[in-house]
Amino acid sequence: MNELVQILKNTRQHLMTGVSHMIPFVVSGGILLAVSVMLYGKGAVPDAVADPNLKKLFDIGVAGLTLMVPFLAAYIGYSIAERSALAPCAIGAWVGNSFGAGFFGALIAGIIGGIVVHYLKKIPVHKVLRSVMPIFIIPIVGTLITAGIMMWGLGEPVGALTNSLTQWLQGMQQGSIVMLAVIMGLMLAFDMGGPVNKVAYAFMLICVAQGVYTVVAIAAVGICIPPLGMGLATLIGRKNFSAEERETGKAALVMGCVGVTEGAIPFAAADPLRVIPSIMVGSVCGAVTAALVGAQCYAGWGGLIVLPVVEGKLGYIAAVAVGAVVTAVCVNVLKSLARKNGSSTDEKEDDLDLDFEIN
């Protein structure tokens, strides 16, 4: 029981392992799919007769997005029980996906499969059987249990839950989607690639899988604003930053363009009280702008690098610009106030010293 509790305590770590291994499938599949639709020029799936090559490119993209579900589950299981859990979790997630369980089904299959395999590995066996357990017995039994649970137990209800979430997201009114944008902007900027950021990113991936591309665009904007905003801040308020920070700002601009939120971490580590609130406000402003203009992003990533697969490019660029400018202005204002307060304090201390010497 203690082992089970420990596994569940480390759930976040297991989920992050799965998500990190899934990202290449999301990015490559999503971008190839979006490129095929964009080149077709009709906002629809390319027709196999009219343009067979674009249809094949579309199918490659679909393959990438389809594989993200079993690979997510496989590496969640791998984090829990290592190699023997790969097949049971991947197959369990595939079975769950046949019911429409999608991302949630992968999470459940990965955790269940990992736990099942973990305990199967604990069963004492004769030394003759030890060599075949990890490559024969455990994968078969683990797959039967995990896939069986998804097939006859959890697959259908989880699929219904996923479908309900999709309908809710697609039916959101403007007020609701603005509130969602506020929440996602705050979460994405708060710890810049940490656990809170990853929760929001996982929600973005759910939206990719379910085709809710407006929410994907909101997250894509929120992801890139912290580094872009801090890079811009070093350009317009040079006196508020050291020479080293100004050099870091150049790297942050590049990282923001390619959707790496962690580019803002050096600034937040040096001055968290002024940087973190600024990037959170900026990300919220950018995310809300993206929601209001109705931009859509077809790839599960952020920054300007995904611009070719964005619908409503001008609105998307405007949202990024709004967020970056707000961040840069906020952080420079706060730093300027801090410098002035620091100077005033120093002057008062000098006056006190002078008075003391005269007296």
Curated annotation (Swiss-Prot):
Record key words, sorted: Cell inner membrane, Cell membrane, Membrane, Phosphotransferase system, Sugar transport, Transmembrane, Transmembrane helix, Transport
Membrane protein topology class: Multi-pass membrane protein
GO cellular component, one term: transmembrane transporter complex
Lineage: Bacteria, Pseudomonadati, Pseudomonadota, Gammaproteobacteria, Enterobacterales
Example GO BP: phosphoenolpyruvate-dependent sugar phosphotransferase system
Domain notes: The EIIC domain forms the PTS system translocation channel and contains the specific substrate-binding site.
Organism for this UniProt entry: Escherichia coli (strain K12)
Residues covered by the PTS EIIC type-2 domain: 11-344
Entry's transmembrane regions: 19-39, 60-80, 99-119, 135-155, 176-196, 216-236, 251-271, 290-310, 314-334
Origin: domain of life: Bacteria
Function: The phosphoenolpyruvate-dependent sugar phosphotransferase system (PTS), a major carbohydrate active -transport system, catalyzes the phosphorylation of incoming sugar substrates concomitant with their translocation across the cell membrane.
UniProt subcellular location: Cell inner membrane
Single GO MF annotation: carbohydrate:proton symporter activity
InterPro entries according to UniProt: Bacterial_PTS_Sugar_Transport, PTS_EIIC_2, PTS_IIC_fruc
Protein name: Fructose-like permease IIC component 2
